[in-house]
């Protein structure tokens, strides 16, 4: 029995020695193999085993035997430092396209020929963009642990480690404070609307996004607040038509995005969308609510053109305004068709910026507006 155990021990030791040789051969330096040898060795181990592992160096590596051991973290590749593209991604500069709604009151109030109004609207766009970028950084810092486990969000600069937590905090504070101070300097009403936006956005991130219908209503309100910001910064007259249209239109788009999430989890065995308050059986309801809201938005626009724009005297040929709701309705129906097919991969507004058909419909609508003047 003792001979058998001794034989087994020698075989195990032989395998360990061979493994140590392979590790030493691959590592190339004594400093790299020493921690591994320490791990494999035993207080009662054969000293020859240690000598084998420490001397099994490849050709050309003997001169490195006296080099000090390297720390374990040097075996890992450090993430690249953030470049301009990383910061642009972290600040979500592509999302600034949504902030273009700030310029909408400038056109509807027919102040687009006034340099002062154009300047203030542009400053408002930049100031508000800084605060929204700060809010995106804060959200990523809060969700950092979850983002690092997410299949796509783990590539975000903060989650990937290309931007450090300290850098994120400093930039977020700088942008937030700078944006709020700039908002106060532009207009107290603009600053108040911006504070309301940030408060609602934070509430959405921490709680409201998990509540069915409350989430899409919050998104709708955030879009409408962008229009309110544009109205406040140029001191234009408030338009109930525009605000009503915005609530119905963006409510429909927000539901379209939720609808595609429901369709994608259908058949996966899940009953609910992760992190949302919807169940897969409610997809027909979201479709009904969303398409009804789209129809309501188009009715409001048609009533505005007929009852206000056509009789305002601001347009020489108001009839050319009617292609605008027609093109918008076609675009909304296209969004819902893609949502039903599960092909709407982006936010509808961001999708429109990348979609060729959306651009074609937009050109027709813009041509109608130009001919109306």
Residue ranges and their predicted role:
Residues 1-108:
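C-terminal cap/substrate-recognition subdomain and adjoining C-terminal extension
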Residues 149-194, 240-250, 288-294, 358-373:
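Multi-pass membrane catalytic core of lipid/isoprenoid biosynthesis enzymes
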Residues 206-216:
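Membrane-helix interface "capping/anchor" motifs
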Residues 40, 131-159, 214, 255-263, ...:
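Acidic (Asp/Glu-rich) catalytic motifs at the cytosolic membrane interface
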Residues 71-148, 161-174:
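Topogenic membrane-insertion module of multi-pass membrane proteins
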Residues 103, 107, 177-181, 199-203, ...:
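Alpha-helical transmembrane segments of multipass membrane proteins
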Residues 55, 64-89, 145-158, 261-275:
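Non-transmembrane, extramembrane segments of multi-pass ion/lipid transporters
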Residues 83-86, 93-95, 206, 224-373:
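C-terminal membrane-associated helical module and adjoining short loops/tails
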């Amino acid at each position: 029995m003792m001979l058998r155990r001794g034989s087994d021990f020698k075989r195990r030791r032989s395998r360990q020695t061979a493994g140590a040789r392979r590790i030493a051969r691959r590592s190339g330096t004594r400093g790299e193999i020493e921690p591994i040898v320490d791990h494999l060795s035993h207080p009662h181990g054969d000293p020859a085993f240690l000598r084998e592992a420490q001397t099994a160096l490849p050709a050309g590596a003997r001169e490195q035997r006296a080099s000090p051991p390297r720390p374990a973290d040097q075996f890992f590749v450090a993430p690249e430092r953030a470049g301009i593209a990383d910061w642009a991604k972290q600040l979500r500069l592509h999302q600034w396209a949504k902030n273009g709604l700030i310029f909408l009151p400038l056109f509807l109030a027919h102040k687009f020929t006034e340099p002062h109004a154009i300047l203030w609207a542009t400053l408002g766009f930049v100031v508000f963009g800084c605060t929204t970028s700060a809010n995106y950084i804060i959200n990523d810092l809060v969700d950092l642990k979850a983002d690092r486990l997410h299949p796509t969000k783990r590539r975000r600069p903060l989650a990937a480690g290309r931007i450090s937590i300290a850098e994120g905090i400093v930039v977020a504070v700088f942008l937030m404070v700078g944006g709020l101070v700039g908002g106060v300097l532009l207009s107290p009403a603009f600053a108040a609307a911006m504070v309301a936006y940030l408060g609602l956005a934070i509430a959405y991130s921490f709680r409201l996004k998990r509540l069915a219908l409350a989430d899409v209503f919050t998104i709708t309100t955030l879009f409408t607040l962008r229009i309110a910001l544009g109205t406040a910064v140029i001191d234009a007259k408030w338009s109930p038509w525009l605000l009503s249209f915005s609530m119905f239109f963006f409510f429909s788009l927000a539901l379209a995005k939720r609808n595609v999430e429901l369709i994608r989890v259908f058949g996966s065995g899940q009953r609910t969308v992760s992190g949302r308050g919807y169940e897969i059986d409610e997809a027909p309801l979201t479709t009904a609510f969303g398409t009804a809201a789209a129809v309501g938005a188009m009715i409001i626009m048609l009533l505005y053109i007929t009852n206000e724009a056509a009789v305002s005297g601001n347009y020489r040929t108001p009839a050319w305004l009617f292609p605008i709701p027609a093109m918008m309705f076609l675009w909304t129906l296209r969004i819902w068709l893609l949502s039903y097919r599960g092909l709407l991969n982006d936010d509808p507004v961001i999708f429109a910026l990348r979609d060729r058909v959306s651009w074609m419909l937009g050109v027709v609508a813009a041509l109608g507006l130009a001919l109306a003047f």
